Amino acid sequence: MPTDRVYVRSMPAALMTAEELLQTSIPDKHVELVRGVLVVREPAGYRHGRVSMELAFLLSQHVKATGAGQIVSAETGFKLASDPDTVRAPDVAFISRERLPDPQTRGFPALGPDLVVEVLSPDDRPGETLAKVGDWLEGGARLVWVIDPERRVVRVYRQDGTETHLGETGTLDGEDVLPDFSCSLTSIL
């Protein structure tokens, strides 16, 4: 019996770029690029979609009335980092008028929205959610709302590192990102 060992070294997987992500089509899936690695998830469930849409509607009404900027919904990707690339797609986002990308922009705008809304699904893991919040804040987001429909709570994260937890009787506040916007959690949960 031979005593020599054979070692096989596997090549590291090639990292994907934001441009390659644009060319990738995976029907009926939610995809993001995290530090060059493609992350594929199942579509969101009904409750997730309803909460996202309720809040997007309220935000859109406010933004249209004030001319503050634009609201975008799920599947809108934002390039938050390069080499390796990170492209995240929030459930709802607000971009202020001053930071709006050119309407002819193809691909993913290289910016973090001013306000990011993430609605948790039952299979979301806390560590992954915190990593996502970190990516948003490092990418330029000023305010991140993480809504948990199951527990009926919201965690609010700010670029200055502070955070707030709201119970189901709490009120979402646009703070200095969307002045004069507020809505009760009961109206969206």
Regions found by a protein language model. Give the residues of each.
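Gly/Pro/Ser/Thr-rich low-complexity, intrinsically disordered segments predominantly at protein N-termini
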Residues: 1-189
